[in-house]
Structure formats: C-alpha cells, structure tokens
C-alpha cells in the first residue's frame, strides 16, 4: 500500500482524502466520528503505536474536511445522507487501499459504522476497536440527559429545553451551556487534540444524523439499534470508553459480555 496523502475517486465520482502513515505489518484503518468530524484525531496514532509496527490509514468521509462536500440541498445528493451510503463508502475505501485481514477502529459515529461493517463485511477483519460508542441510540439519549441534569442547575436545564423546543439554537446562553457540557464530557483536554483556526465540523452531515449538538438526539440516527445482532461480531474486539463519556459505561460492560471475544478498557479523565 502506498503511504502518504492521496485522493481516492469513488465510483460515484466524488473524491475522498486519505492518509497512510507507517510501514509496519499490522494494518489499522481509522474511521472518524461526528458525523462530520475528520481524520486529524488519528494523525499521531502511527507515531504513538510505532511506525515500524503499525501502518495507520485514515480518511475524511464524504462531506467532511478535505473530502468533497456535496450540496446536500440538491435532491440528487440526498441519497448520500444515509447510513447505508457511509457503510458502502467505508468498504470502497478498504478496497481501494487494498486492506485485507486488517484492524478497524471507529470513534463515536465511526464506532457505529465499525459495528455495521463487522456485521456485513467481517470476513475482511482481523480485529475491531470501538471507541466511545455503544450498540444502540435508545440507551444513549437518556444517559446524556442525565449528564446534563447532573452538571447544570434545574433552571439551566429548563432554559436549554425551552430553546430546543423553539429550535433557537443560536441563542448565546444556550451555546454557552453546550460549551460547558462539552468541556465536561466531549473534549475535556482540548490542548491535547487537533487544533484548527476555524471550525471543521461538517454541520449539514452532523445536523442530519445527530441534531444540533451531542445533547440533542433528534437526527436520523434515532432508532439505530444492533443489540440483537451484536453477538454475531466474532472478531476480537476492544471496547474503550472515557471515565467522563457521553456513552453509558454500563452498556459498554453489557456489550463486553455479549461479544464473543471482547475486552473493555476505561481511560481516566
């Protein structure tokens, strides 16, 4: 496999940004979260894991960062706002990168895609890594609501609910409260993460699937649930969560028991 940065042309004509670093025998493909985030969260993985041990590939999904960004208001592009599309995109990336018997890592939304991929294309995998993602949305929504109630005052929570009902998400006080929650549960140490001068989130993609923010789950992912199929993922699987995570750890522990070959780790702070 070629290392470095490349643009892949998909069968649909769009281009995706990809980067491959390292020359080790272990192959790792990383799938970013969001939806609508980007590859930069993985840029130090090869150096930290050892470039002579692991070859790390990453890419920006359609609509994100360096990849093509369709105008989703156009009817012909609405078909690309679907879970099925992003799953097929992941498989096409694998094919074009020539990956076989590889490890797949998915963070957040990428962890959702990784589960879907393991269920449909598991024959290509050597192992699976799911970072901060559970196997359904139904148990996510009440958990983030509980986190909000634990962190903010009753009046602040009521204020946020009122803004959400009115869909006035640009309200300055509301944005401030979202920032407070994000600092507790989404990005506790921004100094350790990628730094961009401007926001790089693909908001049309994020808003469609998620909603306005991590604490409002009103998007197309509502209803996603693989609890009944999770046991069919038979490759060795690492589940990893943060001590302060928007995903409920008790569900992660249940997943560990359900998956035939799984291990769970917890990252403090």
Regions found by a protein language model. Give the residues of each.
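Conserved alpha/beta-hydrolase catalytic His-Asp/Glu region
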Residues: 164-220, 229
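Short beta-strand/loop motif that positions the catalytic acidic residue
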Residues: 233, 239-241
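Catalytic histidine neighborhood in serine/cysteine hydrolases
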Residues: 252-269
């Amino acid at each position: 496999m070629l290392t470095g940065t490349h643009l892949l042309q998909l069968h649909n004509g769009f281009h995706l940004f990809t980067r491959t670093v390292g020359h080790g025998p272990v192959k790792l493909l990383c799938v970013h979260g969001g939806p609508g985030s980007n590859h930069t969260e993985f840029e130090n993985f090869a150096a930290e894991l050892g470039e002579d041990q692991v070859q790390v590939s990453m890419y920006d999904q359609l609509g994100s960062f360096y990849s093509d960004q369709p105008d989703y208001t156009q009817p012909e592009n609405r078909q690309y706002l679907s879970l099925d599309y992003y799953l097929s995109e992941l498989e096409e990336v694998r094919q074009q990168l020539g990956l076989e018997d590889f490890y797949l890592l998915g963070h957040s939304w990428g962890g959702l895609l990784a589960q879907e991929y393991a269920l449909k294309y598991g024959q290509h995998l050597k192992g699976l890594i799911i970072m901060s993602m559970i196997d359904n949305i139904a148990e996510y929504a009440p958990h983030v609501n509980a986190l909000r109630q634990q962190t903010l005052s009753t009046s602040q929570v009521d204020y946020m609910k009122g803004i959400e009902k009115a869909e006035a998400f640009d309200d300055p006080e509301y944005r401030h409260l979202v920032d407070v929650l994000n600092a507790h549960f989404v990005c506790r140490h921004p100094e350790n993460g990628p730094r961009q001068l401007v926001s790089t989130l693909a908001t049309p993609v994020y808003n469609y699937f998620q909603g306005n923010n991590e604490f409002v789950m009103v998007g197309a992912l509502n209803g996603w649930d693989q609890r009944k199929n999770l046991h069919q993922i038979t490759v060795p699987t690492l589940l990893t969560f943060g001590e302060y995570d928007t995903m409920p750890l008790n569900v992660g522990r249940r997943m560990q028991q359900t998956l035939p070959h799984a291990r769970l780790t917890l990252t403090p702070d």
